[in-house]
Amino acid sequence: MTMETPLVYLSRLDEDRFGVRTAKCGRLGSEGIPQVMAFCRKHQVELLIARCPTIWLTAAQELERQGFLLMDTLIYFSRDIRAARIPRVRPGITVRGYRPGDEDGIGRIAGDCFHDYLGHYHADSRLDREKCDEVYTDWALRSCLSRDPADGVLVACVGDDIAGFGTMHMNDSTQGEGLLFGVSPSFRGQGVYRAIMIHCLNWCAERGLEEMTISTQVTNLVSQKTWIRLGFEPVSSCYTFHRWFT
């Protein structure tokens, strides 16, 4: 891990939302388990959220032996921006950058899309369901109002209506990452998500980035099919575990 991304850290955002002291670990292998567990004991952590690459099966099995519960599996895709021409968006859908005032529509779409979402928060029966829903609405709104953690917010419109959104982040000088996406139930099946993804690729190209990466739940086949049709390929996957200490 880099100095900017410690192996394990306290998540004030999750603690404020759920009312339990929470720590996160983005990449946990066998050798890091003692350090992470010691950190949690020292800081009186109640909930640890840890990700483990699926290729580290021995580590995943050790986590299970130590009381960690599997909550979800993420699959990551990547596309070389330079490898092939970026397709054009079909007529009838406009994708533009975020404008002040868009946040109300974006927040509503996030609320609709992520109600009872099959992610690691909702998979944990000890976490309040409504507060789990709020994770994604709050994420979308923060991306608009404070650009945290997003570097860009793209908004899809059909006529005067906001039909969907996508958020982008620059991981470094060569790679962009798609973070959070949503399409209004009223506009699904009309190519809105595809249009947003195409503009995300253009967003990367305009900034001279070489690659775009994106991830989702392994069960989210609809999104994965869209990515594959746009030239993305699967590159890695990881488990998300929760470990309660109370």
Regions from the PLM with identified roles:
Residues H43-P53, Q175, C204-T216:
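Conserved GNAT acetyl-CoA-binding A-motif
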Residues G26-D104, C238-R243:
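Acyl-donor-binding surface of acyltransferase catalytic domains
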Residues I55-L70, Q190, R194, E206, ...:
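Conserved active-site alpha-helix within GNAT-family acetyltransferase domains
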Residues G119-G176, L180-V183:
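A conserved beta-strand-loop-helix scaffold within acyl/acetyltransferase catalytic domains
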Residues A50-T58, P185, I214-Q224, H242-F245:
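Conserved beta-strand-loop-alpha-helix junction that forms the acyl-donor binding cleft
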Residues L7-C25, M71-L74, A150, M170-L179, ...:
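A conserved beta-turn-beta hairpin within the catalytic core of GNAT-like acetyltransferases
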Residues S30-A38, L180-P185, G189-E206, K225, ...:
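Conserved acetyl-CoA-binding loop-helix of GNAT-fold acetyltransferases
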Residues V20-R27, V89-E134:
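Short amphipathic alpha-helix that is part of the acyltransferase structural core
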